[in-house]
Amino acid sequence: MYVTKIEPVTKTKYKVFIDGQFAFALYKGELSRYHIAEESVIGDDIYDSLRLIVVKRAKLRAMHLLTDMDRTESQLRTKLKQGLYPDDIIEQAMAYVKSFGYV
């Protein structure tokens, strides 16, 4: 897999594009820890590790959003989408909170 572009979102958060398509958002520390830079190649093992990190972050974010106030499934999806989580990861986070009966 080829990292085509890294676009800053905030001072510490970046959008990572792999093979021309948005893959996920990572923090500056994660980019340096996994040696991710524009025009670099990442292996499947690193990609899978990054996906696991983002899935865990999405689940924690969903749980945090529900501690502040009750939200509908649609509201929760919208907030996760605003947080730059990919659709398939949002689905995993939604399944996670549904498994506890929170949504």
Task: List each model region and its residues.
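An alpha-helical, amphipathic repeat domain used for nucleic-acid recognition
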Residues: 1-103
